UniProtKB/Swiss-Prot annotation:
This is Basic phospholipase A2 homolog Ts-K49a. The record marks 121, 124 as: Important residue of the cationic membrane-docking site (MDoS). It comes from Trimeresurus stejnegeri. Keywords: Blood coagulation cascade inhibiting toxin, Disulfide bond, Hemostasis impairing toxin, Myotoxin, Secreted, Signal, Toxin. Expressed by the venom gland. The lineage of its organism: Eukaryota, Metazoa, Chordata, Craniata, Vertebrata. The record marks 128, 133 as: Cationic membrane-docking site (MDoS). GO terms for biological process: arachidonate secretion; lipid catabolic process; negative regulation of T cell proliferation; phospholipid metabolic process. It holds the Pfam family Phospholip_A2_1. Snake venom phospholipase A2 homolog that lacks catalytic activity. It shows myotoxic and weak anticoagulant activities and induces local edema a few hours after injection (5-10 ug) in the hind paw. A model of myotoxic mechanism has been proposed: an apo Lys49-PLA2 is activated by the entrance of a hydrophobic molecule (e.g. fatty acid) at the hydrophobic channel of the protein leading to a reorientation of a monomer. The record marks 127, 130 as: Hydrophobic membrane-disruption site (MDiS). Disulfide bonds join 42-131, 44-60, 59-111, 65-138, 66-104, 73-97, 91-102. One of its GO terms (cellular component) is extracellular region. Residues 1-16 form the signal peptide.
Length: 138
């Protein structure tokens, strides 16, 4: 159980409601979110935004940009709720910021599914020090 929690915390850099985000990713891709995406490429997991290695890595880049736009809620601490209806994620928050955070997580989960063909197991655990800085803005 402790190992599961540690892996969940690695998932996309401790941001967001980690449990909900992990469930979304699993529901959309069928992959273990922590081991498949927790340290993928240059943008998944802890650290700043870098030049994406592929479309899957770009999903994480865009996710970090989405979180950067949030106001009035804390993606690290705050939690939201969502439901899985007819194989679709439905964000169910009344709080506008929590709803937006849920939408950010929904978008990255769908992005991962849509880019499963670019997923490269060799990039699953990437040393971030070999990642290039990017001048691209969110």
């Amino acid at each position: 159980m402790r190992t599961l929690w540690i892996m969940a915390v690695l998932l996309l850099g401790v941001e967001g409601s980690v449990i909900e985000l992990g469930k979304m990713i699993f529901q959309e891709t069928g992959k273990n979110p922590a081991t498949s995406y927790g340290l993928y490429g240059c943008n998944c997991g802890p650290g700043g935004r870098r030049k994406p290695k592929d479309a899957t890595d770009r999903c994480c880049y865009v996710h970090k940009c989405c979180y950067k736009k949030l106001t009035d809620c804390d993606p690290i601490k705050d939690r939201y709720s969502y439901s899985w209806v007819n194989k679709a994620i439905v964000c169910g928050e009344d709080n506008p910021c929590l709803k937006e955070m849920c939408e950010c997580d929904k978008a990255v989960a769908i992005c991962f599914r849509e880019n499963l063909d670019t997923y490269d197991k060799k990039k699953k655990i990437n040393l971030k020090l070999f990642c290039k800085k990017t001048s691209e803005q969110c």
